[in-house]
């Protein structure tokens, strides 16, 4: 297809069709029919190609990480780009958004910041308000059953950080190696992490 898709896993739309991001110069999001493989639509991404993960909210809105300092795009299930981008001016890199049951979107930026947005694209909070937690250019946030947000970071502050749903820090765990993965949460609420040093960590 000529589609450039490093770091980008397909996602399923609310009606079960396949979503693919294109990181190339003609950066776009494609929807493909799940039964036939036929392309249903292709929409050029605003301000940069799809550079990282695609996540779909309960309302069917598609969120995709954009290349450059363009944040995350929002696209309807019918392929219409919505305004505004989430976090324009920040670098999304190869990061996946997390979306809660209320439609709030939690994203991480390469600059070492986590931010939350409502389902209309309005920023609710960001942490830290200034400075950095450590580079976040892979993986992304995960949401626990109680609404806690977990994210792993890289140098200069390789760590796992837990944030409240309102954006306040609950705790952090310093890692011996960088973390470039999304935390996984088991049925007991334990946090599972793999770091770049080959360590498997349970918190």
Each model region followed by its residue ranges:
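Extracytoplasmic/lumenal domain signature
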Residues: 1-203
């Amino acid at each position: 297809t000529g589609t450039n898709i490093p770091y980008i896993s397909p996602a399923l739309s609310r009606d079960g069709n396949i979503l693919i991001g294109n990181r190339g110069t003609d950066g776009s999001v494609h929807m493909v029919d799940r039964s036939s493989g036929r392309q249903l639509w292709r929409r050029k991404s605003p301000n940069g190609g799809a550079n990282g993960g695609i996540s779909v909210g309960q309302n069917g809105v598609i969120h995709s990480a954009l290349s450059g300092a363009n944040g995350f795009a929002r696209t309807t299930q019918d392929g219409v780009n919505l305004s505004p981008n989430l976090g324009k001016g920040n670098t999304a890199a190869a990061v996946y958004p997390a979306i809660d049951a209320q439609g709030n979107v939690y994203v991480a930026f390469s600059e070492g910041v986590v931010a939350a947005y409502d389902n209309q694209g309005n920023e609710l909070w960001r942490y830290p308000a200034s400075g950095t937690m450590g580079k976040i250019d892979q993986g992304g946030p995960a949401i626990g059953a109680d609404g806690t947000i977990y994210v792993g970071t890289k140098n200069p502050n390789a760590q796992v950080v837990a944030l409240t749903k309102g954006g306040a820090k609950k705790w952090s765990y310093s890692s011996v190696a960088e973390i470039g993965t999304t935390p996984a949460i088991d049925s007991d609420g334990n946090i599972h992490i793999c770091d770049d040093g080959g360590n498997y960590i349970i918190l």
